[in-house]
Amino acid sequence: MFASNLLLLLAIILPLASLLLALRPDWQQAYRYCLPVLPLPALLAGLILGPGASLELPGLLLGGLWGLDELRQVFLVLTATLWLVAGVFAVGYLKVHYLRRFCVFWALTLAGNLGLVMAQDIASFYSFFALMTFAGYGLVVHEGTGEANHAGRVYLAMAVVGEMAILSGLLMAAQQAGSGLLADLPAAVAEADRRWLIMFLLLAGFGVKAGLPLLHFWLPLAHPVAPTPASAVLSGAMIKAGLLGWLVTLPFGEVSLPDWGNALVILGAVGSLGGAVLGVRQRRPKTVLAYSSISQMGLMTLMVGAALANTEYAGPLFAVMALYVLHHGLAKGSLFLSTAMALPAGRAGQWLLWLLIALPGLSLAGLPFTSGAASKLAMKDLLKPGNFEFAMAPYLPMLMSAGAVATMLLVWRFLWVQRAAASGGSNPAFMYLGWGLATAGSLVLFWWLPWPGAVPDKAWLATMVYEAWSLFWPILAATAIAALAWRSVKQR
């Protein structure tokens, strides 16, 4: 009990205590090397403690309760892993200018991101969510350029709108529940007289972070200007906080809401396909990846809609969404870190580099025997025709296939613009190490990380041989479309 409490407490205390290193300018180099250490207690908690671990803090705010369940464990492992590998990468990536300022905002954002995942009471959850959001502004504007400041203003404006909506929704839900615990909110929201208003506020507020269509504007502006390690955690971990907010507050499993389900499936489809349409028109690698994140979160929004529409499948869909979050976060973190890698001098080294860049991208598209294939097969098994009875249900398999084609088109576009932007040179050892760990996490370690117990059997490697064609054809279709587009442009 003491060890588990200590780990949960250290997960937050260590990043906050590291701020003491910012008191003296001559400690900033030591602070840089501490960045990879800060998420270690959280990672150990996620890997060792497992569901059921909890820590009561009666003197904190209105009474704090931090802990893990199956869903939070997956989110915590992903979040801590991404911040760790990005921290390793940052040691080699960061320059001397504004180093201390970067480390301060990094530690504050990390504490908020880890805290909101573990928080089980409303006050802690919202406090950590707000800390992550507003400290993240410092990472977005770190470079201080005109473009960064513009992105920061848009980010801050959208953040304020989102936080106001979240706080209003949480207060209304808490009043209805008569409780300060997140676990009591779904049932209370389901029975509330103003359920539609509470749900709208929570969907919109968390939707800002999750990149919901029409609330996504900050994403393609912030990612290109933020330092590369910050972009990796913005897209790989922080954007998932919006999804987690939905999953722990909305009335999943309490009442079937087919109208809300239909609306979210449509919004998810718009995000998935619209993000791809806008993304393939971009010319900067990180901007393409930002739109790819919007597209991928569209698939998550689609699944949220399906879970709201049918109480019976809410639990299994939670497990599949958690698996998809783990896959997408690791792959996207690797891709973002790769944008800062210089090409080695030798041809063999360049081929190896491009292979390791391409594989996480192909995983996003569902290449067999990758984490993406596991996630997509699990989704396909649940969203097959006949499982759901709301209006948009018959279109779910088609939308998933279209999303897979859209993802592969974005992967090809990313590789094309990354090839044009790449330059030769040497990379610091810590950059190689951080990017290598992120890539290994996506391609290899994913299979040994904690998975939710309710993940369908189809997600396992043994089934991928029989499902190879269903995984391959979207990749082949997107490749054919990309080849035709390239040929058309070349002939002009």
Residue ranges of each PLM-predicted region?
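Membrane-interfacial helical/loop segments at transmembrane boundaries in membrane proteins
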Residues: 56-61, 185-187, 378-389, 448-469
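Hydrophobic transmembrane alpha-helices and their helix-loop junctions in integral membrane proteins
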Residues: 85-95, 100, 108-125, 135-427
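Cytoplasmic/organellar membrane-interface segments at the starts of transmembrane helices
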Residues: 350-352, 411-492
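Hydrophobic core of alpha-helical transmembrane segments in multi-pass integral membrane proteins
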Residues: 10-23, 35-51, 80-87, 170, ...
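Transmembrane helix-loop-helix hairpins at membrane boundaries of multipass inner-membrane proteins
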Residues: 1-104, 181-184, 217, 492
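Alpha-helical transmembrane segments of polytopic membrane proteins
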Residues: 4-11, 72-77, 261-265, 324, ...
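Interfacial loop-to-helix junctions that mark the boundaries of transmembrane helices
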Residues: 1-6, 63-72, 123, 185-193, ...
